[in-house]
């Protein structure tokens, strides 16, 4: 498998690339040092911080017995085996720490980056064990099912005939704002699986995919059970532990965080706002807009409702308009901790209070909002864990590799390599298209147009001194003529490209095929496509291949992986 690493700073997909903050966080630049110092507690590139984190976590007290018993029960219910059990049992020891990641529940596991997160957590845990053999590190995947954004969770996408095919499960007996985890599938799920499988590559692996999906997704089953059982089947050879945070047993462990949020609200929101201002002063955008109260209330029907604070000592559950005093809210949390659900601000705090989190595996968006949370961690007396970027891949099939070869032939200079063409495609695809058409027609066409514009501008500028001595009022006319001459050349250039495009439809179609494969819907492939397309075509071994790649590469660069077969 040919692989190439691309710097995030040089990637700009057609619609949306990676944020400036994430590019700086993964770069080797002075901006990174400032960002780390202002926004985080630990730097995953500094070895001294690793010893510091080991000491900090070893000194903290966790409810390990309760945590282990809960995880054993949950993973057994999800279909976990001996690998999960052995990994969970290690957490009884104060010398065992967690490498945590997680993702919102998605149909058939959702997009590729869900899989990449899990793989990265597994590999980072292995690497820490090799560095610190006296400690154990276990990978934990947080099942984010308390969200109520059903539409996002209930859809998935595969490639079919060089196009994208979308599949969506419609809500079934679902109340407004009901949590995704407890939403069930209707009889339609069987049809969706059959329709999707029919479009998957017709290989011996396709039957296995169909069987797995039908066994995990069936009428009456909940999103959480289906997602969790699928993940454990995919990672059956790995010690990945799943965690459901919606259970009462987990909420009891997190209760002190909810208590402090109730007692101190809206203090956390003010701290996020202050940190956001600091972040913006560094030139970055703030992702998260905090609320006065940073948790939701889940009613007896499983509906996730906002909690507002109309006055300093009053909380109100929306839309029911139920009002409670601060004391009443504390009593409610004491009696029914399962009714409390952290929002995006409080969620990582809950995670790192309950779990001995050594490191969290995060995506680009998560890095952005975690940069706003340093003062919140300090408010709750917790050190932020290492924030390690998840593995990031673009999987390139042989037919797309052949398009890359053609682009090298058409647009490349002597010595132009595969990595050169990937850098060009990922930094400015539209320019690659333009160059490909122009170079196919005339190798120096783009250069000739640029030269024409420069020569016309220089010729007119040479007149400036003479014209200004004759009549200074001619200078604005000359300046306008320089602009018009450039526009004239650009008009001719555009018409030339259009004429050339008509002559090179086949090449354009191949480039379009590559664009759909590399940047579906104009964004990175990992944000759109489902893993089962690739499993059906290349088998379950693709997970081992990606795992091996992560062992050999740092996760702070994007990896292009050319698949074989």
UniProtKB/Swiss-Prot annotation:
Classification via InterPro entries: Bacillithiol_biosynth_BshC (IPR011199), CC_BshC (IPR055399), Rossmann-like_BshC (IPR055398)
This protein's record includes keyword Mitochondrion: no
Keywords linked to the UniProt accession: Coiled coil, Ligase
A GO molecular-function descriptor: ligase activity
Pfam families cross-referenced by the UniProt entry: CC_BshC, Rossmann-like_BshC
Top-level division of the source organism's lineage: Bacteria
Enzyme Commission (EC) number: 6.-.-.-
Residue stretches in coiled coil: 439-519
UniProt similarity note: Belongs to the BshC family.
Full protein name: Putative cysteine ligase BshC
The gene coding this protein: bshC
